């Protein structure tokens, strides 16, 4: 899987504990993809928690392609992720920008579909996601970024549900790198 520094290996273990405690549920759920599932992961209780966001941000920063000059994601799930990663990067002396991708282009003002600093064309941007199922949200973000002449090589996610997202992204020449897969939750005999 991913080879992390010793510190981030510990961060990853602590993050999994937090996700199991605050984000994972068993039951009958309809996912954003429209699929039914007996397992639900809502990472927002962890990504909107100071310690959780710190863990995610450190792990994403180490996992991210070093050629990336910005991170981006579709609002709302990616909002804390992109903010956390650029703040963590800044604390380490790294320059990284962030873009928030609107689900719908504004109907007023500048009619922007992207929010954030003005970046040069062909800037390499990494897309951040909380959970990837079919990768529909990530693909929407990638298309919007590519329409604006940015280069997207990868998507980083907290969890890959292993339901076709990896393959869908591969069709768009995008590498999916995930901190965890659904198996990590199932192997830990989560009883929620």
UniProtKB/Swiss-Prot annotation:
GO molecular function per UniProt: magnesium ion binding; orotate phosphoribosyltransferase activity
GO BP annotation list: 'de novo' UMP biosynthetic process; pyrimidine nucleobase biosynthetic process
Needed cofactors: Mg(2+)
Residue numbers binding orotate: 133, 161
UniProt key word Nucleotide-binding: no
UniProt keyword annotation of Membrane present: no
Record EC number: 2.4.2.10
CDD domains: PRTases_typeI
Highest taxon listed in the record's lineage: Bacteria
Alphabetized UniProt keyword annotations: Glycosyltransferase, Magnesium, Pyrimidine biosynthesis, Transferase
Pathway(s) this gene product operates in, as recorded in its UniProt entry: Pyrimidine metabolism; UMP biosynthesis via de novo pathway; UMP from orotate: step 1/2
Catalytic activity: orotidine 5'-phosphate + diphosphate = orotate + 5-phospho-alpha-D-ribose 1-diphosphate
InterPro entries hit by this protein: OPRT, Or_phspho_trans_dom, PRibTrfase_dom, PRTase-like
UniProt subunit comment: Homodimer.
UniProt record similarity statement: Belongs to the purine/pyrimidine phosphoribosyltransferase family. PyrE subfamily.
Protein task: Catalyzes the transfer of a ribosyl phosphate group from 5-phosphoribose 1-diphosphate to orotate, leading to the formation of orotidine monophosphate (OMP).
Protein's name according to its UniProt entry: Orotate phosphoribosyltransferase
Native species: Prochlorococcus marinus (strain MIT 9515)
